[in-house]
């Protein structure tokens, strides 16, 4: 269990780094385009709970993957349908935590309008990827997936 916690923390600190990378990219774009940032203490403080919530949600979801002896990033299809922990509330807690909360939180903390826009624009793309994955999950898990899908929302 301790090793799973360490792996989860390591994996999710990487996602936070990517979130700040997107925010820094946005800051650079703001500078190149002459867009005024909105960096302030209030915006920075507002970003902290978003980032923390995203990290917690991803860590919780990652731990559930590890407890089921699954990889968070895998090219092979899932063999287990996880419906416990954060998966009781969202079918996509990894994406919700990372691609939404962490990315928006980092963008707020750095006060970058471009980073917020990049984050907002990539969510529909991620949603398309999720829909594709869900078709595969339906083929793999059949009726079990359909019952889960009916009970739990994709995002929130």
Name each model-derived stretch.
Residues 1-84, 97-156:
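Membrane-anchoring alpha-helices and their flanking helix-loop junctions
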Residues 89-96:
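Histidine-centered phosphotransfer motif of kinases
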């Amino acid at each position: 269990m301790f090793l799973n916690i360490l792996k989860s923390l390591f994996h999710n600190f990487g996602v936070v780094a990517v979130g700040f990378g997107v925010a820094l990219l946005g800051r650079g774009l703001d500078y190149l385009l002459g867009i005024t940032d909105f960096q302030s203490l209030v915006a920075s403080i507002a970003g902290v709970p978003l980032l923390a919530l995203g990290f917690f949600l991803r860590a919780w979801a990652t731990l559930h993957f590890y407890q089921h002896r699954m990889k968070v990033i895998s090219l092979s299809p899932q063999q287990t349908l996880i419906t416990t922990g954060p998966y009781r509330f969202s079918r996509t807690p990894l994406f919700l935590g990372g691609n939404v909360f962490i990315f928006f939180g980092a963008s707020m903390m750095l006060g970058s309008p471009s980073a917020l826009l990049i984050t907002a624009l990539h969510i529909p793309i991620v949603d398309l990827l999720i829909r594709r994955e869900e078709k595969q999950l339906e083929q793999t898990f059949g009726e079990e997936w359909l019952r889960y899908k009916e009970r739990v929302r994709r995002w929130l």
